[in-house]
Regions:
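Active-site helix-to-loop segments that bind/position phosphate- or nucleotide-bearing substrates
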Residues: 148
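ATP-binding N-terminal substructure of ATP-dependent carboxylate-amine bond-forming enzymes
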Residues: 1-127, 136, 143, 155-158
Length: 159
């Protein structure tokens, strides 16, 4: 039998860590594409961001739930902050978290910690540290036999 409770229990959520943007064309496109993908799959969006960021910037997409982390932006979150966010997600976002992501590079580490606590797939903190250390990342790729171009050259365009 169909009931409101069964609909709530089946609701899926995407946690988006870092819902504010610099306003660049690229980031606006990423957020819009993420929003459209969630809408297409009937996934609700729970935005998570720092209070100070939210004072100065407006999320470029609609979110169904917005969780504020107290204070200024910081690169990492401690265990108590993570536990508090997880509890708030469980309280305010009935159903299940299907995914957790960060579209902006400077929110990847916070997302990794939160996704681990929620129990969804993620890049580990070590992986993120390696990716964000560009010279070390390029060196690891080279050692694995994967060579990247040093710069992008477009045929017919002079620099």
């Amino acid at each position: 039998m169909f009931s409101r409770d069964s609909v709530v229990a089946e609701r899926k959520w995407a946690v988006l860590v870092g819902v504010t943007t610099s306003g660049s064309h690229a980031s606006t496109h990423w957020f819009k594409s993420f929003y459209e993908a969630c809408q297409k799959r009937h996934i609700m969006i729970c935005g998570v961001d720092f209070e100070e960021e939210l004072k100065n910037k407006i999320p470029p997409i609609s979110v169904d739930c917005l969780i504020r982390i107290s204070g200024l932006y910081r690169r990492s979150l401690d265990a108590d902050e993570i536990a508090k966010i997880v509890t708030e997600i469980e309280t305010r976002c009935p159903g299940r978290v299907a995914l957790s992501t960060a579209l902006r590079e400077n929110y990847q580490l916070q997302n990794s910690l939160l996704a681990e606590a929620i129990g969804v797939a993620r890049n580990t903190a070590d992986c993120i540290e390696r990716i964000q250390d560009k010279p070390a990342c390029r060196d690891a790729l080279r050692k694995a036999g994967i060579y990247q171009p040093q710069s992008l050259r477009i045929v017919g365009v002079t620099s």
